[in-house]
């Protein structure tokens, strides 16, 4: 095959990404070939596979690609808004599937278990989000919920909403989680204050606050592990 100067329709049947997937299965395709299926077509001078290879080379890895926005993707020649939206949507579906699989498996026995559940959800976001894991008496996760979404510097949490959702889910324990997009693990004074406020309210309602995790891309800070609780 003479490289990237031919449109995919001119390639041999064995080299076309869609046909290759049908014949050999999805596992047989490279990342660039899978992305080429999403893109659908390239240009006169560049195939969809070559365009995908160029984007992947720029992103370095799939994790970095997932962080790209539509506005960033359309800067690549050959990628319009529709193609960019398709890429972003597909990557987001993959992230959600991964997060769901992890959640189904988990009984919380340590702060690391909570981190494993929440890192794929908030660990790599460019903005701050505050979430709660709702647990039963066996420390199994019943549900999870986003309480607030903010900017780079912080987010506001409604304490009443924390316990409204907790009681609706029949939870006996909660784990608070939020991310720091800056990568800074240490809690701010505001982090400590909201934790204390929620913990005090939980004692009144007989709902135990088991921990509060600050999550970044690769690490986490546990209030319990650090002796703040």
From Swiss-Prot:
GO terms for molecular function: metal ion binding; metallopeptidase activity. Signal peptide: none annotated. Residues 107-229 form the MPN domain. Zn(2+) binds at residues 178, 180, 191. PROSITE patterns: MPN (PS50249), UPF0758 (PS01302). InterPro entries: MPN (IPR037518), RadC_JAB (IPR025657), RuvA_2-like (IPR010994), UPF0758 (IPR001405), UPF0758_CS (IPR020891), UPF0758_N (IPR046778). SUPFAM superfamilies: RuvA domain 2-like (SSF47781). The keyword Kinase does not apply. The keyword Protease applies. GO terms for biological process: proteolysis. A motif (JAMM motif) lies at residues 178-191. Keywords: Hydrolase, Metal-binding, Metalloprotease, Protease, Zinc. Belongs to the UPF0758 family. This is UPF0758 protein Fjoh_0413. It comes from Flavobacterium johnsoniae (strain ATCC 17061 / DSM 2064 / JCM 8514 / BCRC 14874 / CCUG 350202 / NBRC 14942 / NCIMB 11054 / UW101).
């Amino acid at each position: 095959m003479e490289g990237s100067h031919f449109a995919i329709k001119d390639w041999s049947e064995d080299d076309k990404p869609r046909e290759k997937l049908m014949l050999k299965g999805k596992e047989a395709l490279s990342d660039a070939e899978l992305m080429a299926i999403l893109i659908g077509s390239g240009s006169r001078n560049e195939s969809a596979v070559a365009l995908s290879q160029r984007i992947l080379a720029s992103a370095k890895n799939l994790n970095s690609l997932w962080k790209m926005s539509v506005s960033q993707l359309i800067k690549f020649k050959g990628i319009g808004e529709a193609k960019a939206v398709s890429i972003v949507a597909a990557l987001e579906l993959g992230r959600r599937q991964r997060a769901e699989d992890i959640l189904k498996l988990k009984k919380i026995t340590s702060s690391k278990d909570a981190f494993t559940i929440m890192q794929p959800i908030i660990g790599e976001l460019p903005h701050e989000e505050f979430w709660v894991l709702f647990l039963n008496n066996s420390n199994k996760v019943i549900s999870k919920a986003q309480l607030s979404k903010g900017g780079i510097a912080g987010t506001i949490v409604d304490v009443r909403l924390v316990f409204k959702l907790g009681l609706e889910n029949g939870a006996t324990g909660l784990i608070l989680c939020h991310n720091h997009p800056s990568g800074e693990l240490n809690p701010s004074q505001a982090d400590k204050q909201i934790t204390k406020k929620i913990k005090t309210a939980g004692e009144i309602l007989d709902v135990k606050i088991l921990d509060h995790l600050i999550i970044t891309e690769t690490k986490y800070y546990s209030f319990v592990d650090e002796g703040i609780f």
